[in-house]
Amino acid sequence: MFTLHISAKAQTENLTVITNTKGAPEELKFSDLRSILMGEKQRWRNGNKIMIALMKTNTAAGNSICKKIYDMSSDELKKFWLALVFDGKSDGPVFLNSAAEVQSYVAENPGAIGVTDQQQEINDTHIVLIDGKKAF
């Protein structure tokens, strides 16, 4: 059982940020990424609206996103976003079932940013370096 826990943790340790090729920079500091994903920054420099795509919090990658980026539990993250949306401060993220769905959403929406557990680029997306690294 201990071995399985380590294996599952190793699979979700590395997260990758992808963006649509229209609007987003090719590199971000982790602090800037966190600001974007907290809804504090709403537009890219070119004026495109930032749209956030995340893995559902009941997935291993989604749980890792909650901990590594937001420093929250999945329930805390849901409450955080409900409050922001209710107060009209930000549009909430789109929560998707798989890395493939996140990649498709990001590819189809200029200004979109997504976090997945896979280092893969598809048409109209690119991997954003976070503090100079492809994965964190």
Model-derived regions, located:
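C-terminal segment of classical bacterial N-terminal signal peptides
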Residues: 1-7
